[in-house]
């Protein structure tokens, strides 16, 4: 069934285009002067973090007919198909892993602190973690720019 659906979607440029428009509605939470763009001092690491990578990997996988089902595999395989450099692909995967790790840590902490499971105060992180998170969001931004070039016509 998955193969049949993949074949149907692969040739449907309107569907892929609509998925791309939807994926581009959420931008990485990067503000001016190397600040995070927060709401009430927090970022949603699911919506503004992992979703950015998951959506883009899924869109390109559907477009390219890639059968991988997890985001890391999709990023690796579609990265090759869309001619991203090896270092860019590695950066995409590392950035996704970092944001996903922060999200999982936040979800675990929410069990004891009662706060929202996906709501993260980026300034509560140490300086190194903040820098890595910023770079992870820049990597997501790079993927979104590529998506805009390929689908937002």
Which sequence ranges carry the predicted segments?
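A nucleotide- and high-energy phosphate-metabolite-utilizing enzyme signature
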Residues: 1-153
């Amino acid at each position: 069934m998955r193969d049949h659906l993949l074949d149907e979607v692969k040739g449907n440029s309107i569907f892929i285009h609509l998925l791309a428009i939807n994926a581009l509605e959420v931008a990485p939470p990067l503000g001016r002067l190397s600040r995070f763009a927060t709401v009430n001092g927090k970022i949603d690491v699911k919506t503004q973090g992992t979703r950015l990578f998951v959506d883009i990997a899924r869109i390109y996988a559907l477009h390219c007919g890639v059968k991988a089902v997890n985001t890391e595999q999709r990023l690796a395989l579609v990265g090759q198909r869309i001619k991203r450099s090896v270092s860019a692909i590695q950066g995409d995967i590392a950035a996704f892993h970092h944001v996903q790790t922060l999200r999982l840590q936040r979800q675990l902490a929410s069990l004891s602190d009662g706060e929202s499971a996906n709501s993260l105060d980026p300034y509560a992180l140490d300086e190194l973690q903040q820098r890595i998170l910023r770079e992870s969001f820049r990597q997501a931004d790079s993927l979104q720019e590529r998506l805009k070039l390929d689908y937002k016509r």
